[in-house]
Amino acid sequence: MGAKTYEGGDHHEDATNVLSTKSNAVGGKPRGANMLEDGDGEFGSDDDDDGGDGQDSSLAMVNPDDAAKPKKKKRSKKKKNNKKKSGAGAQRQTSPPRVPLSQLFPDGKYPIGQMVEVQDENLRRTTDEEFRYLSRGTITDDEALNDYRKAAEVHRQVRRWIHETIQPGSSLTELAVGIEDGVRALLEHQGLEPGDSLKGGMGFPTGLALNNCAAHYTPNPGQKDIILKTDDVLKIDFGVHVNGWIVDSAFTVTFDPVYDNLVAAVKDATNTGLKCAGVDARVGEIGGFIQEAMESYEVEINGKVYPVKSIRSITGHDILRYRVHGGKQVPFVKSNDQTKMEEGEVFAIETFGSTGKGYLRDGPGVYGYSKEPHAGNVHLPLASARALLKTINQNFGTIPFCRRYLDRLGIEKYLLGMNSLISHGIVQMYPPLVDIAGSYTAQFEHTILINSSGNEIISRGDDY
């Protein structure tokens, strides 16, 4: 989930093998590959466990002369028992995902994300004093780390279902509800009782942004349902939290290969940002590497070539407990921002690319809301506002939510109270973010845990 706002730097192509994923299979044309094509790159004005088979390998060494002995029967029985034992608890996830993770991982230990060894010695802490100074935050806490990994596994399993089922003709409302129902089922927190959704659930409303809408769109009550088309570019951005530790990850879905270069550009840029992240890395420099990777691509649409531009008005961000947007930002363009990443911090490294202007403005409608973390005690004259604030505190805290979530709780006639909370600075409203009409935008995002001994891309999967 991007946070609302830079040229230069060297781009290192796949600096580590460990970061090579199947994302690189998407072909990309560097800038200039289509010099013989027409087009000026503008859309116009803004006026518009690998398990075995359960067989004991030692049986292959049994002497054939022993076949007639009574022992064979006993050994055969043992083999059968072993085979049965190996299948015990080997439950598989359903589609749609509804088997709780507590049943799939009865030991309560969840898969580790992709570990990335620090390559630059200047980013490695070498003294005990420095390590003690920087060893703070969340990732040194084993319980919190396991919560992160649990949330990441839920994210992977739910998006696996998305990849299996999404197709032209899909309803965005049904897709959003399916994602959120899957997250709640796997975490065993339906969020219908006060406080339950604060133990585990959605980290923010499911983002389903189409085409020139880059971010912050979700289907809400009263809106006409949108049906996915073959020529659409869909960004799917959703968060999962366990005890307030939020995993924020996003990807782009297309059905027409004409958009392959756009997808490749953004995927490359995100992986570049992940490679550059680390203790003492400066966010302005990371933005430069991201921009160089992103803007080395171009895409041809309907015979016209467009450069892929890094979007400037939205950024990656650090993540705090129960707060998907912390105080630090990671731009997608080079800047002079000398802010450093520090030991123990968690970041959402995301990038957005566009065939349009590369600058987003507020679109019509409302994506969602969140309570301001530093909102003070304010007298609210409206009883509806006071009641709504109580509901927000009990069910969401500072986690973003949307109108669908309020309707799901049975809350009615809350718009007047919501407007009061917004006007008093207690609640923030998020509109959709759009580039110029006719343009296309793409997004990829991962959550990374910053550690001097090596970062963990907690949300990495076999899909991206």
Curated annotation (Swiss-Prot):
One of its GO terms (cellular component) is cytoplasm. Pfam families: Peptidase_M24. SUPFAM superfamilies: Creatinase/aminopeptidase, Winged helix' DNA-binding domain. GO terms for biological process: proteolysis. Its cofactor is Co(2+); Zn(2+); Mn(2+); Fe(2+). Its EC number is 3.4.11.18. Residues 37-53 have a biased composition (Acidic residues). Residues 70-86 have a biased composition (Basic residues). One of its GO terms (molecular function) is initiator methionyl aminopeptidase activity. A divalent metal cation 2 binds at D248, H317, E350, E445. It is found in: Cytoplasm. Residues 1-106 are annotated as: Disordered. Binds 2 divalent metal cations per subunit. Has a high-affinity and a low affinity metal-binding site. The true nature of the physiological cofactor is under debate. The enzyme is active with cobalt, zinc, manganese or divalent iron ions. Most likely, methionine aminopeptidases function as mononuclear Fe(2+)-metalloproteases under physiological conditions, and the catalytically relevant metal-binding site has been assigned to the histidine-containing high-affinity site. It comes from the Eukaryota. Keywords: Aminopeptidase, Cytoplasm, Hydrolase, Metal-binding, Protease. It catalyses: Release of N-terminal amino acids, preferentially methionine, from peptides and arylamides. Substrate binds at H216, H325. A divalent metal cation 1 binds at D237, D248, E445. Cotranslationally removes the N-terminal methionine from nascent proteins. The N-terminal methionine is often cleaved when the second residue in the primary sequence is small and uncharged (Met-Ala-, Cys, Gly, Pro, Ser, Thr, or Val). PANTHER family: METHIONINE AMINOPEPTIDASE 2, METHIONINE AMINOPEPTIDASE 2-2. Belongs to the peptidase M24A family. Methionine aminopeptidase eukaryotic type 2 subfamily. This is Methionine aminopeptidase 2-2. It comes from Talaromyces stipitatus (strain ATCC 10500 / CBS 375.48 / QM 6759 / NRRL 1006) (Penicillium stipitatum). The lineage of its organism: Eukaryota, Fungi, Dikarya, Ascomycota, Pezizomycotina.
